Amino acid sequence: MAAACPGTAVPVWLSEEDLSCIICQGLLDWPTTLPCGHSFCLQCLKDLWVSKRAGVDSCPWACPICRKGPSAKPVLHKNPLLQDLVDKYRQAALELEAGPEPAPVPRSLCTPTPPQVTVQKSTTQVVQELTELVGQLVDIVKSLQTQRPSLASGLDNALGILHMDSSSEEEYPLDSPKLVTFSASQKKIQEILRDLEKIQETLQGSVTGNEAPKKQVEEMASSVGLLPDQRYPVSRKASQFSLWAISPTFDLRSLSCNLEVSNNCRMVTVSRALQPYHWSSERFSISQVLCSQAFSSGQKYWEVDTRNCSHWAVGVASWGMKRDKMLGRTMDSWCIEWRGPSQFSAWAMMKKTDLSSGPPEVVGVWLDLELGKLAFYSVADQERPLYECEVSSSSPLHPAFWLYGLTPGNYLEIL
């Protein structure tokens, strides 16, 4: 690739988190870079070393991130390149906030580019999985069929006892509704079993031969009612909140250009390249996104799979939240946030609260606007409380999410 000519200005997309200090969570102030390559505010690093929270026995001047460092205290110098970037970012942010609306973009960029979803499974794999599922259904139906004779004999015995104990001369006719129902059910099970076995044979033939056409696979799946999206896991709603469970969807208007969403708008991924979405004041300048659904009353519950994201935040925010601020750093947003080992925290009313538990694989979010309550749970077989706070907003609240923008491929998924 040809290099840019000297003096050529190359646009670079930066967010506050790209130039922030992991210690104070703010923009770098007098940035200094350690030999390992990690940068921090000079004073933040000094204070941390003095408090001995970053050091280890063998290396008291360790980097707070990678825990590497020299045995002797290093001389800290200002990083002029980083300082220049921070100054330019701060000035650009002020101009963007106070300046006029930018000129209209070309029409070709007015519509967000549909996110490309990578196909992870071949048709053969899908057919093989369907074959296994149908096989399980066949076993279930056969099991039910074997249980029918015992049920029938139990029914006959019960009818016989009733007949002997009855003081009247009433008898159960051969066309008793109970007996007719049993006969019809038995016939229906046999029909279902025959249909399933035919489908099973067809699927097995497709696996051993060439890949079945997509339309044929869809028709076979539809005939037995097997229509789950193989890419997305089945939702695990905590039983305590099942009556209020929802599956909100991401709002494309607020979606950062660093992010992409899946076709069903329930998975958000850190993009490997900046997306050419149409610019508007509703779009986040950092790696965040809101959901389309807004809540101003009642109770709602949803779950988020965080297993495939190294740094994330999950919470709620009003639509009017500033688009250059992170969740929890405004008066109208609340969240829990995971930034790596020993960096699990909650943010409410612009205040940080450290959380002692480890990162949850699935986060359950309970929003009770009648009581003004927001609670987060770690969801496995049952929900375990993580954090609870009060919420108060004059505007409806939306589910809100943040992903670390420098880890392409990381994603969060609403279950």
From Swiss-Prot:
Subcellular localization(s) per the UniProt record: Cytoplasm; Cytoplasm, Stress granule
GO cellular component, one term: ribonucleoprotein complex
Family annotation (PROSITE patterns): B302_SPRY, ZF_RING_1, ZF_RING_2
Pathway note: Protein modification; protein ubiquitination
Secreted found in the keyword field: no
PANTHER family: B-BOX DOMAIN CONTAINING, E3 UBIQUITIN-PROTEIN LIGASE RNF135
Protein name (record): E3 ubiquitin-protein ligase RNF135
Taxonomic source organism: Rattus norvegicus (Rat)
Gene: Rnf135
